[in-house]
UniProtKB/Swiss-Prot annotation:
Compartments (UniProt record): Cell inner membrane
Protein's organism: Haemophilus ducreyi (strain 35000HP / ATCC 700724)
InterPro entries associated with the record: ATP_synth_F1_ATPase_gsu, ATP_synth_F1_gsu, ATP_synth_F1_gsu_CS
Molecular function via GO: ATP binding; proton-transporting ATP synthase activity, rotational mechanism
The protein's name: ATP synthase gamma chain
GO biological process: proton motive force-driven plasma membrane ATP synthesis
Length: 288
């Protein structure tokens, strides 16, 4: 059995670790709430742009924007959003597993895959397995800015516009609740149709657009795609903070359980030490 002094040192070390994990849990909780607010604030904007795009596209019968036309798929581009930091449980691993299964399904159809990556964990992983990375962004921090994200988005948009890829998808972790984050893969280009499109059934009117619907549609589509990617980045960030909060809480609880076990071992060691001292005193007295 380890000595009492050694056990006390271990208990102090675990207590220090417990303080760190508890602090990280509290920080993650605060950041998660702020990110949730940012996530909720951006959704109405994104949804409204999507409805306007749908309305303009339906009103411009003679014009079909390239972003709305489906093609035969030979190459697929993926924007994969991971985290820059670890200590967030299996969040990134689940994302990587899901995307690799998706890539394998495309490969079985003789369709090649190119990547645009957000987050250093994704960059390290996908480059290590030899996948083609067209663009990547790291170091977005806890308050991501649209200007930092636009580069990777435009790279994929231009690749689609130039016929270098025939479809663009986005993969990220969607925030369901504090205990649940779901890996999502969604199609960005060509733009999927709205489900339950109310405009098609309820509205027979149209607006007058200046300078013309085509120019406006092109501008709105770019803005919409940027907004969708930004929302996914914020969603993934909320998932990261939630996963880190849960992981750090589990680490804090485990540290508490370990301290209790070590304290019990320490008490037994201390008891054994006292018993030995008493035995020595009794033996010495008997010898006298």
């Amino acid at each position: 059995m380890a000595g009492a002094k050694e056990i006390r040192t271990k208990i102090a070390s675990v207590r220090n670790t417990q303080k760190i994990t508890k602090a990280m849990e509290m920080v993650a909780t605060s950041k998660m709430r702020k990110t949730q607010e940012r996530m909720a604030a951006g959704r109405p904007y994104s949804e409204t742009i999507r409805k306007v795009i749908s309305h303009i596209a339906k009103g411009s019968i003679g014009y079909k924007h390239p972003f709305l036309i489906e093609r035969d798929v030979k190459k697929v581009g993926y924007l994969v959003i991971s985290t820059d930091r670890g200590l967030c449980g299996g969040l990134n691993i689940n994302l990587f597993k899901t995307t690799l299964n998706e890539f394998k399904a495309w490969k079985d159809k003789d369709v090649s895959v190119e990547l645009g990556l957000v987050g250093s964990k994704g960059v390290s992983f996908y480059q290590s397995i030899g996948l083609k990375v067209r663009a990547h962004i790291t170091g977005l921090g806890d308050s991501p800015e649209m200007e930092r994200i636009v580069g990777a988005v435009n790279e994929m948009i231009n690749a689609y516009r130039n016929g270098e890829v025939d479809m663009v998808c986005i993969a990220y972790n969607r925030f369901e609740n504090t205990m649940s984050q779901k890996t999502v893969i969604a199609q960005l280009l060509p733009l999927p149709k709205l489900e339950n499109d109310e405009l098609e059934t309820k509205c027979s009117w149209d607006y007058l657009y200046e300078p013309n619907p085509q120019v406006l549609l092109d501008s709105l589509l770019i803005r919409y795609l940027e907004t969708q990617v930004y929302q996914a980045v914020v969603d993934n960030l909320a998932s990261e903070q939630a996963a880190r909060m849960v992981a750090m809480k589990a680490a804090t609880d485990n540290a508490g359980a370990l301290i209790d076990e070590l304290q019990l071992v320490y008490n037994k060691a201390r008891q054994a030490s006292i018993t030995n001292e008493l035995n020595e005193i009794v033996a010495g007295a008997a010898a006298i």
